[in-house]
């Protein structure tokens, strides 16, 4: 059974006298920095010159280059996209990691897959809120919080767990509950969820349903409504009440269709494919492919992305969403399964 920690379980004043550097000031960085600051913790921000630098200053933070922030800090939280972390770490953080400091992440990818190899004389842990930055910030302001994960990779001081929990408390996570895990478990389950269910599996399912209807002669607009637009209603019900709560809220006809047809679509073969996806994550195949793809400037990524953006479901969706003033249009990218961009 997972171990969960709350505010009352966490030692007081663990971060007193320590300086925390937030590296990156996107959605998560913004939330972490403000929440920690309002929790009475000494926070600075390390970020490149640009909009994020200016925004951090306007929010009242002391802002430095990444190297300068890392040099000053006792605790360095890296909140950059996975694919940027190794380069920034090697160029601007590594040499500032003197003995006794703590190196912190919100996702274990680069440490688990050995793209970042921390020195042996620093603590290494992760604190990962299970929600996007705007939610981490909003719930904190409301006196609540978003559940978070923490894991210890390297405990040189003997105090890494206390420090990790104190950090989680500082961003509001311990108000909701902080769950203990490992870098391996956090990384592999996060990647699997993204690939097999939340992003890869779901988008493939939606497209397959849309194509099945349109290829059978149904109007693409109706196919869009039934296979994509109405998804939010169902997901919101599952989010709030679980599968059983969702089924309670839908019609009996829909529920019966769920029972008899769902297993025909997601059958044993699909589950076997999911197991292969998990194996590729566990043995490092996916990580190697993604690392190489970034090293050669993402030719496959860019080609697939361009092709997907031209799918009929996108064209129909853009037209239909113009009829829906209640749907926010635009390019806002608030990722719920990863840390925010710098």
UniProtKB/Swiss-Prot annotation:
Cellular component terms per the entry's GO annotation: cytosol
Alphabetized UniProt keyword annotations: Amino-acid biosynthesis, Branched-chain amino acid biosynthesis, Magnesium, Metal-binding, NADP, Oxidoreductase
GO BP annotation list: isoleucine biosynthetic process; L-valine biosynthetic process
Cofactor note: Binds 2 magnesium ions per subunit.
One Pfam family from the record: KARI_C
Protein encoded by which gene: ilvC
Family annotation (PANTHER family): KETOL-ACID REDUCTOISOMERASE, MITOCHONDRIAL
Binding locations of NADP(+): 25-28, 48, 52, 82-85, 133
Pathway(s): Amino-acid biosynthesis; L-isoleucine biosynthesis; L-isoleucine from 2-oxobutanoate: step 2/4; Amino-acid biosynthesis; L-valine biosynthesis; L-valine from pyruvate: step 2/4
Cofactor dependence: Mg(2+)
Positions of Mg(2+) 1 binding: 190, 194
Domain KARI C-terminal knotted: 182-327
The protein's Enzyme Commission number: 1.1.1.86
Protein name: Ketol-acid reductoisomerase (NADP(+))
Organism listed in the record: Bacillus velezensis (strain DSM 23117 / BGSC 10A6 / LMG 26770 / FZB42)
Record field: catalytic activity: (2R)-2,3-dihydroxy-3-methylbutanoate + NADP(+) = (2S)-2-acetolactate + NADPH + H(+); (2R,3R)-2,3-dihydroxy-3-methylpentanoate + NADP(+) = (S)-2-ethyl-2-hydroxy-3-oxobutanoate + NADPH + H(+)
Similarity-based family: Belongs to the ketol-acid reductoisomerase family.
GO molecular function: ketol-acid reductoisomerase activity; magnesium ion binding; NADP binding
UniProt: substrate binding residues: 251
Annotated Mg(2+) 2 binding sites: 190, 226, 230
Catalytic site positions: 107
UniProt keyword Cell cycle, yes or no: no
């Amino acid at each position: 059974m997972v171990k969960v920690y709350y505010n009352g379980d966490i030692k007081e004043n663990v971060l007193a006298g320590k300086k925390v550097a937030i590296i990156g000031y996107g959605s998560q960085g913004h939330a972490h920095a403000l929440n920690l600051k309002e929790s009475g913790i000494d926070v600075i921000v390390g970020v490149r010159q640009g909009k994020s630098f200016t925004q951090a200053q306007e929010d009242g933070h002391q802002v430095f280059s990444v190297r300068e922030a890392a040099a000053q800090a006792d605790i360095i939280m890296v909140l950059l996209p996975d694919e940027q972390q190794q380069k920034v770490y090697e160029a601007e953080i590594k040499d500032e990691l003197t003995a006794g400091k703590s190196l912190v992440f919100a996702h274990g990818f680069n440490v688990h897959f050995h793209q970042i190899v921390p020195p042996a004389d620093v603590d290494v842990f992760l604190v990962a809120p299970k929600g996007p930055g705007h939610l981490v910030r909003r719930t904190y302001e409301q006196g609540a919080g978003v559940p978070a994960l923490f894991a210890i990779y390297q405990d040189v001081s003997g105090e890494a767990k206390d420090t990790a929990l104190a950090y989680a408390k500082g961003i509001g996570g311990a108000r909701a509950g902080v769950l203990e895990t490992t870098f391996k478990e956090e990384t592999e389950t996060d990647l699997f969820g993204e690939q097999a269910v939340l992003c890869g599996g779901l988008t493939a399912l939606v497209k397959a349903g849309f194509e099945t209807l349109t290829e059978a002669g149904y109007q693409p607009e109706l196919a869009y409504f039934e296979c994509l637009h109405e998804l939010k209603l169902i997901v919101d019900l599952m989010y709030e009440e679980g599968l059983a709560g969702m089924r309670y809220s839908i019609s009996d006809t829909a529920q019966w269709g769920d029972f008899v047809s769902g297993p025909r679509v997601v059958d044993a073969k699909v589950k076997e494919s999911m197991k292969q996806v998990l194996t590729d994550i566990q043995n490092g195949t996916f990580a190697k492919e993604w690392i190489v793809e970034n090293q050669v400037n993402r030719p496959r990524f860019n080609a697939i992305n361009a092709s997907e953006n031209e799918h009929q479901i996108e064209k129909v969706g853009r037209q239909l969403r113009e009829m829906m003033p209640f749907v926010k249009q635009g390019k806002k990218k608030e990722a719920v399964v990863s840390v925010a961009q710098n």
